[in-house]
């Protein structure tokens, strides 16, 4: 959520900025009307509250003197219903204004390139050289079919489209990847390993920005009278650990890592990536989350992105680093780097990690604060999140980049300790 003072004091300027850099239309006239009505109701409510307080004081004084207070009580009763109705109306219009504010995306940092979509993203760097094959290569679907490793047919019987059953050595490789990533981030990068719930309440989703805007992307379940949601990323659970908290300065930065199942409806994906495991309803990720002081978030963003890059480098997977433009960034982000891994079968780089600095956008929604040791006052923290990395896509990249002419897969050296020393599968 943006700073409310921007909506109250710089509405026209904010609307112009959102339109230019985010392609987001803010209804200025409607917001001005709401704000004007809020002020009117608030003034009326305060006047009635002041009148009630003065009458209550007069009643107390009269009673202490033994005087009859029936007329004063009648006066209070006469406007009490009006006061109650005014308080309800004020709360309703505040809720309406908050609903509008919750639907406004974050503003980008000044160094984020202006653009409409992914075509305007800016490549920052490349690592590794794509392998040249001396045989006809297969994609991960064909490689999986050769050995019965990837079973979409059984998954469809169990759950429907966009699910896959992993069998045998490839399931083991998938597990090895997740364990290796988590060990790297915990042992070498200083993240605390956290095991989090994958079913969360609506408050958690409002906190990180998935609700109210992206409800159609979420899987949900009804538990009695309460609706719960399956997480689309463990960023949700990890970040909300600091919701409504005041963190002492010496505890920052907080760095947390989690390996979890994730669930997405892919409502807006249309017919993209229907073949194979690129875009699934259920997948796994190792997620990184940092909570820090505002002045440290840019450095923390660079550090987090570098931690994700290290995963791809230790696996020997060629990748490129992309700075997303204003029109391609996520709703809550103020700056985002994507890492894209090379897939030989497609002859292109595909996203495998997204690392975002959200500034104080999520913190304001969650009321996540730190105590400034100089002023002694609580201030909003900055939150960051990044994939470190998507496990299924890493498995696909390993399968394709490490394939052999006979359809076997060479196991990257860093994974062999997790696979009892196996150097090849298939």
From Swiss-Prot:
Pfam families: Seryl_tRNA_N, tRNA-synt_2b. One of its GO terms (cellular component) is cytoplasm. InterPro entries: aa-tRNA-synt_IIb, aa-tRNA-synth_II, aa-tRNA-synth_II/BPL/LPL, Ser-tRNA-ligase_type_1, Ser-tRNA-synth_1_N, SerRS_1_N_sf, SerRS_core, tRNA-bd_arm. Keywords: Aminoacyl-tRNA synthetase, ATP-binding, Cytoplasm, Ligase, Nucleotide-binding, Protein biosynthesis. The keyword ATP-binding applies. Pathway: Aminoacyl-tRNA biosynthesis; selenocysteinyl-tRNA(Sec) biosynthesis; L-seryl-tRNA(Sec) from L-serine and tRNA(Sec): step 1/1. Consists of two distinct domains, a catalytic core and a N-terminal extension that is involved in tRNA binding. This is Serine--tRNA ligase. It comes from Xylella fastidiosa (strain 9a5c). The gene is serS.
